[in-house]
C-alpha cells in the first residue's frame, strides 16, 4: 500500500445505527474524521504544521453512499490527500466493507488551513507546498 494513504478500521456499533438498522448518514462524518486524524498522525509533515497554530477547516464535503453498513460490519477507511491548490486542498476517502471489499462510501473533503491566531486562511505555498506536495496521490491511478 502507498505510504501516502492511511487505513483506519472501524467496527459498526449499535449507536452508529438509525431506525432502519443502517449506519446513520451523520456517523459517516465521524468515520471520515477518524480517517483524517489518522492521516495527520501518520504524516508528521502535516502534523508539525498543525501543531504550530494552524487548523484544518472543512469547507465542502461530498459523500457518495454506495452500500448500507450494518451492525458489526468491519469497515476500512482509506484517506489520502488528492489535491493542493493556492488556498485549499482536497482529501479523498474510500470506505469499504472489509469482508466483501465492497465500496460502502466515497467522499471528498475540501479544506483550508486557518491561522488560529489571526483567523486568516494560510496560503498553501512555500513551506506548506513543500510539506504537502509530496503527499498528493493521483486517485485516477488508483484501482
Labelled PLM ranges:
Residues 1-76, 82-143:
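Terminal targeting signals and extreme-terminal segments of soluble enzymes
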Amino acid at each position: 500500500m502507498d505510504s501516502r494513504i492511511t487505513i483506519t478500521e472501524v467496527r459498526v456499533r449499535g449507536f452508529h445505527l438509525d431506525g432502519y438498522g443502517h449506519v446513520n448518514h451523520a456517523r459517516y462524518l465521524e468515520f471520515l474524521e477518524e480517517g483524517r486524524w489518522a492521516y495527520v498522525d501518520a504524516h508528521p509533515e502535516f502534523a508539525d504544521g498543525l501543531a504550530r497554530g494552524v487548523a484544518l477547516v472543512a469547507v465542502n464535503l461530498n459523500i457518495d453512499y454506495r452500500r448500507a453498513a450494518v451492525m458489526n460490519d468491519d469497515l476500512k477507511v482509506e484517506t489520502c490527500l488528492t489535491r493542493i491548490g493556492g488556498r485549499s486542498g482536497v482529501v479523498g476517502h474510500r470506505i469499504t466493507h472489509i469482508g466483501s471489499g465492497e465500496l460502502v462510501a466515497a467522499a471528498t473533503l475540501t479544506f483550508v488551513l486557518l491561522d488560529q491566531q489571526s483567523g486568516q486562511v494560510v496560503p498553501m505555498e512555500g513551506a506548506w507546498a513543500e510539506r504537502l506536495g509530496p503527499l498528493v496521490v493521483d486517485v485516477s491511478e488508483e484501482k
